[in-house]
């Protein structure tokens, strides 16, 4: 099960078909082991791939089958992250303003849930908080908190890639093209190093 999980993680960024296959294998193994938390994790992996490929309805149906009351603490962040991401994508592609607003409202709710379950000193918390600031046009505050975290010496390349990409978004929306380019370049470099 753990090996399939590592393969899912390796493939998720560039080969969704393969990552989905490993999520399905995780589900098969979880059934054999009769481990509910493994089943929930595998279902969330499949929902992640579905959401990434635009199968929003199917992803939400799969997530809706998970009983939140029995979900172990270590899976709450992933659970809320998936809902936040899928509703955010649905909002981005909604045709009518009314539907777009509803999806973004749901995105905000799950973003707030994420902030409650992520440790306040974690990268996940900082990225979600910066995302919230960016959505509410508080670009300078988002940039400030991201820069504060960026200067931590223990940051790995994958984390740097995510953080600098979010910084580039803050600068883009602020209208600072130079800052945007600078942090996009740093994000690309960190992404390549982490591959």
List PLM regions with ranges:
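A "functional boundary" signal
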Residues: 1-195
């Amino acid at each position: 099960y753990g090996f399939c999980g590592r393969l899912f993680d390796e493939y998720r960024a560039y080969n969704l078909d393969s990552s989905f296959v490993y999520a399905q294998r995780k589900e098969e193994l979880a059934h054999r082991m009769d481990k509910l938390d493994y089943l929930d994790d595998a279902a969330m992996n499949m929902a992640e791939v579905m959401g990434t490929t635009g199968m929003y309805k199917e992803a939400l149906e799969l997530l809706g089958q998970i009983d939140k009351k029995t979900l172990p603490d270590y899976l709450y962040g992933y659970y809320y992250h998936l809902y936040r991401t899928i509703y955010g994508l649905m909002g981005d592609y909604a045709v009518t303003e009314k539907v777009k607003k509803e999806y973004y409202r749901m995105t905000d709710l799950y973003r707030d849930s994420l902030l409650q379950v992520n440790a306040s000193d974690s990268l996940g918390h900082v990225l979600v908080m910066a995302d919230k600031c960016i959505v509410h046009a508080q670009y300078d505050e988002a940039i400030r908190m991201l820069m504060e975290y960026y200067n931590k010496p223990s940051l790995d390349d994958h984390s740097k890639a995510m953080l600098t990409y979010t910084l580039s978004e803050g600068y883009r929306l602020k209208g600072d093209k130079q800052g945007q380019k600078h942090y996009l370049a740093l994000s690309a470099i960190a992404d390549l190093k982490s591959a």
